[in-house]
Amino acid sequence: MNKILLFAIGLAIFSSCTENKKSIIAFASDNPAERVVWERIRLADPATGQIPNNIRKKEMIFAKTLPKSTVISKANWKHRGPYNVGGRTRALAMDVQDENILFAGGASGGMFRSTDGGLSWAMTTSPNQLHNVTCVAQDTRIGHEDTWYFGSGELTGSSASGGEAYYGGNGIYKSVDGGLSWDSLAVTATNTNGFDSNFDFIWNVKTDPSNDSLDVVYAAVYSAIYRSENGGNSWTKVLGGGSAYYTNVEVTSTGVVYATLSSDGTDKGIWRSLDGQNWTNITDSLFTPVYGRIAIGVNPGDEDEVYFLAAETDGYGQHTDVFFNGETWTSLWKYNANTTAWNDISLNIPANQNSSFDNFNAQ
């Protein structure tokens, strides 16, 4: 009897260990990269190995031809989500004509417009357009306020393609009806699924409010700065062209242009131009030698005072501990255009708070 009991106990222990081992194997860590490859194989044309161009638009057109069921009534259904498909909000703007009209663009969710100060929102990008908005700008000149531009293409990862994977765009979109509808600027769009144009990834777009004779627009794209004099119908590269991953551009009310290119590019640094075509590198000799994206802020009360916030400045600037046991370095500098003087004010960046979630973490 004792032998039978011991055998039963041993069998139970062995079974328990086996089950635990199976559980560990069953819940192995995910691999987002393999998921992307798997999904691409499922979507690609077997003959070419590529995802057909404009296939989503064709799919939507075909769906309209399918027979509709009369059994299920719309009254039987209630929308239960998901509601959080906008992704990271990369673009935000207020209409200069009406402060209650707001625009918000998601890195993987499209462009949304509000007419009541943000109490309610309506998507203004159409289903057959790419929904990866990264920046938005209004033409603030008198008589041109209904003209808007937004750039597409997310290089730092989005919910549509995985946390570390980029989400390619399709150029710049333009609206001439106050943001109610958007049309692609054909010269910036390739309508392909691959990375084959600088305009596939746009960091920022700005208009020149000082020029009444030309419709001047600037675009900070992958590795370069482009300029248009006809509202985006044609473009000229005015700065860069190397391998800078991050770029940015800002324009003052008088038409002075500032641009930045990350340290991995050949034309790296902080640049200034009086006409948008001839540029001077104004980077201070003590500025951090390593930097990624640089945000630009012009003081509206004194446009000769410009701030530059640089991320990923390893070993320089302010060190902060961030969530998930991470750490980061960020540098903040102030430039005076009158005196050409630079001040390192990185110590003003919040750090060493009670929680790592309270520390500053640039994107």
Predicted regions: what they are:
Residues 4-13:
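Sec-dependent N-terminal signal peptides
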Residues 17-363:
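Extracellular glycan-interacting surfaces
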